[in-house]
UniProtKB/Swiss-Prot annotation:
Composition bias type Basic and acidic residues, residue spans: 7-16, 170-179, 231-282, 323-334, 349-417, 434-449, 517-530, 570-588, 598-608
Underlying gene: EIF5B
Protein name: Eukaryotic translation initiation factor 5B
Principal localisation: cytoplasm
Biased composition (Low complexity): 20-32
Region span, G1: 638-645
Biased composition, class Acidic residues, residue ranges: 109-118, 491-516, 531-569
Source species: Homo sapiens
Top-level taxon of origin: Eukaryota
Enzyme Commission identifier(s): 3.6.5.3
PTM remark: (Microbial infection) Cleaved and inactivated by the protease 3C of poliovirus, Coxsackievirus B3 and Human rhinovirus 14, allowing the virus to shutoff the host cell translation.
UniProt entry keywords in alphabetical sequence: Cytoplasm, GTP-binding, Hydrolase, Initiation factor, Metal-binding, Nucleotide-binding, Phosphoprotein, Protein biosynthesis
Amino acid sequence: MGKKQKNKSEDSTKDDIDLDALAAEIEGAGAAKEQEPQKSKGKKKKEKKKQDFDEDDILKELEELSLEAQGIKADRETVAVKPTENNEEEFTSKDKKKKGQKGKKQSFDDNDSEELEDKDSKSKKTAKPKVEMYSGSDDDDDFNKLPKKAKGKAQKSNKKWDGSEEDEDNSKKIKERSRINSSGESGDESDEFLQSRKGQKKNQKNKPGPNIESGNEDDDASFKIKTVAQKKAEKKERERKKRDEEKAKLRKLKEKEELETGKKDQSKQKESQRKFEEETVKSKVTVDTGVIPASEEKAETPTAAEDDNEGDKKKKDKKKKKGEKEEKEKEKKKGPSKATVKAMQEALAKLKEEEERQKREEEERIKRLEELEAKRKEEERLEQEKRERKKQKEKERKERLKKEGKLLTKSQREARARAEATLKLLQAQGVEVPSKDSLPKKRPIYEDKKRKKIPQQLESKEVSESMELCAAVEVMEQGVPEKEETPPPVEPEEEEDTEDAGLDDWEAMASDEETEKVEGNKVHIEVKENPEEEEEEEEEEEEDEESEEEEEEEGESEGSEGDEEDEKVSDEKDSGKTLDKKPSKEMSSDSEYDSDDDRTKEERAYDKAKRRIEKRRLEHSKNVNTEKLRAPIICVLGHVDTGKTKILDKLRHTHVQDGEAGGITQQIGATNVPLEAINEQTKMIKNFDRENVRIPGMLIIDTPGHESFSNLRNRGSSLCDIAILVVDIMHGLEPQTIESINLLKSKKCPFIVALNKIDRLYDWKKSPDSDVAATLKKQKKNTKDEFEERAKAIIVEFAQQGLNAALFYENKDPRTFVSLVPTSAHTGDGMGSLIYLLVELTQTMLSKRLAHCEELRAQVMEVKALPGMGTTIDVILINGRLKEGDTIIVPGVEGPIVTQIRGLLLPPPMKELRVKNQYEKHKEVEAAQGVKILGKDLEKTLAGLPLLVAYKEDEIPVLKDELIHELKQTLNAIKLEEKGVYVQASTLGSLEALLEFLKTSEVPYAGINIGPVHKKDVMKASVMLEHDPQYAVILAFDVRIERDAQEMADSLGVRIFSAEIIYHLFDAFTKYRQDYKKQKQEEFKHIAVFPCKIKILPQYIFNSRDPIVMGVTVEAGQVKQGTPMCVPSKNFVDIGIVTSIEINHKQVDVAKKGQEVCVKIEPIPGESPKMFGRHFEATDILVSKISRQSIDALKDWFRDEMQKSDWQLIVELKKVFEII
């Protein structure tokens, strides 16, 4: 209390000083005295602030807790908002109360202006925005620091004007602040904001006495001096303020009209949110702190009519009231209860949640608006581009007519005359100028558009520049007709430069096309200069266009007509589609049009054909008929000698296996099984519904089982719809069986297992005319037991491969369990059950896959050379149909081969395609069939890749490109070396098998061919005699060798190995290689020197000279008989050749590293013998004497006998002997 009394006494002294200062200023002589008291007043205020700081902090904390404890919420919202939100409201409320008393009005104006200064924390003249109120404690300091001035006449008017300007600034800045807060403010910032506002209110409440007193003093002073002129000035000021406010409102209205609808909504929502937040905050602050509104303050202030004594009394009363209020506040400061605090916290949490929700909604709405705007802009852009493209295309057409020489202006005629004159001049000089026809026609190259050549880019650039000029002309003509005569100065100069450059080059003069391009560019320049000429030219163009269109209708179907058709199609599609799908359609058409700009005629035709092929494929895929099924393709896989071909022979009633070389299948074969044969084979099956068989037959593919033919097994499995895996019941799963299982797994191909050779079970009684399940029941107990035992063992082996298996008559779920069918190819048991199961599974589970489709799908299986027919290809036709005369594209070794079908040959039903039969010739073949195709240039065809049919000539390049992609992988496998053997086989499949074997044996191959061995093949192989005679060999697999070719090979020294079984060929060739190697080793035995490093054992010197016999330790390498030795430390003295090596009195050929041996070194013939102790000593290391020839001989013929450490020693010795 003592502190407070002291403060009060200081305040009273302060007031006296202020009054004196004001009086001095009014009289006009107190200008100098004014500053000092004001400064002292500022200092005292600071002191007071420091003293009250602790109390203020406590007040803040307690008021935060009692946010919602008071019950009053919405009553005082308007009152609390009005003094802070708008200056307009303040003025209106003032006007109402000021009507009665002018003196009172003046005092209130002064008072209010001072209050505004305190609230907004303004300095003497500079206006600060209201937003500064957000900055908590800094604001309080400013509030206390502000010096108080007495108000003269001029000051009053200025202050009022400043206040209005400041209010406008404040309102704008508050809006900006609210926007920032709504977009990116967190909950914590809003709390800070609330606290700062509360702090300001507290300050206002805590110091009402001094403010009012100072206000009264000013009022008294100003009331005494006020004149009529001042009143008039104030009135004018108010009117001016009103006018400014009206202008500001009009400006805001205009801005709002300019904003788009989306932005309006956004700003409104933000504004409403901001007001709501401010109102809630203000209402809570007023309830908690009890701030006296402006109206109440005005009511409390005394009238201006009273004299100074009355004012003093009032001041004293106010001080008393202030003391009472402080006491009341202390009582309040005791704090709210825990329940109140909890309620307040919950309310705060709810408020935060509400703010976050509003923020999220606002963000979503903004995002939606942005997306809609982007979509609208994209649509506009696409529309614009479409229009531009149409214009551009029209210009292109006119340009083309001009380039063709149908429209010639005066300048063009002159240019042509010049070009003709230069041509004649060149011809007179004897230069041969090639004409267009004489030049060889360039083959069109289809490349990526990124890889364009520079001239093409330049051409397209010129064309685009000319198009831009044209477009500019049109714009000028349409938009600004006055400026038609004045062309832009830069562009024509550039065009003229390009013309001059073109004329300087005599090659450009010689080419008609390039001169026409230059002329075409000229036309566009002249068009701008002469608009009258342009109109005449346009009329001529229209006439020429009509004639051009007629010519195009008659002749050129691939050119502009195709483009027009494409346009029509795209227009129809666009008109039919909905609004949502439009952008994507336009995008795709954009890319087409853009690419048309710089494409050649061939490229346009290419794209047209590509589109046609895609459209046809799409139509075929839609028109799939599930009612009509094609024949399923069934592949037979398994290990060697499991009886694959024998099973098929039993089905076909043929003897193919007996006719094969060694009974081994080495080619892929196909058999067509008709429906009649299926019914015949399955007659013993009782529950087989023969009436409702939907498949027209079956196409069975037989594959080789040998290790080398993995390529053929792979090819066969990739074609088939379902497979038969043949397993020998006596041997179970074997290596190639497991390989086949993995192939089928990778291709996701369903299969059934034939447990073959059940006739080899002891005491088996055959019964081919009954079901195999019934046959098994009839067998003796020991036979049944053996069968069950072996079947279970095989089921376990399948489980090890990750497959569930069960006997077919016990299999309830064929989708998860593989069916095992016991069969015997010899007796015929189980064959009917096998066929029945295949038919059932294909009809039920594979009906979608077997649905009839017109889209051609065919694969080349084998390439064969047949006598009398030339090279033929065996094709499996999976879908669609083939006709005689069709243009086919097949993969070749040197690229795709285009040829025509000269003949379609089919083997008779139930006959093998690969076996020479009396083939039936057909004009048309439907799927699924194994077909032999006769045609031209099929020698270099590659098997295992698709066959394609071109229905129109322009489709050929498209289909070629498709095949090239698939060809790359196959061609990478066949890589020819510079040095190597020559390989020939009857089919590509067996050739691949042979090449695979050579690759694993590390034998290079330099040439391959399919078909019989001719003289030309021997000539090619004989080239190797010069390079490497060991590779002058022809490996002929399953092919005939012509007599003259054999004679030529004998005379040249070329070896021909021929065999019908691939393994025999392997054996013969490996034997030849070994013999050749031995022969060469004998030949190079004396040249090849093996590296060695030996140390002398001095205690074992048996003979020191001629021959030297001593004990040595082999430190590195290997010592062999015949190795020349030398001593590098004694100037490389040669001591002789190792003629004998002994270990424990036993003679050996080689001594390896680490062994201690006795060696006999004899002197080199013709040289004087060297002596131990004279020419070399025990400390010297002996090494073998190597040379470049010896190293080469080791590399070529003794590589197998060398180890890695030996090669390292050679490297070391090379440095010692300085061998390059």
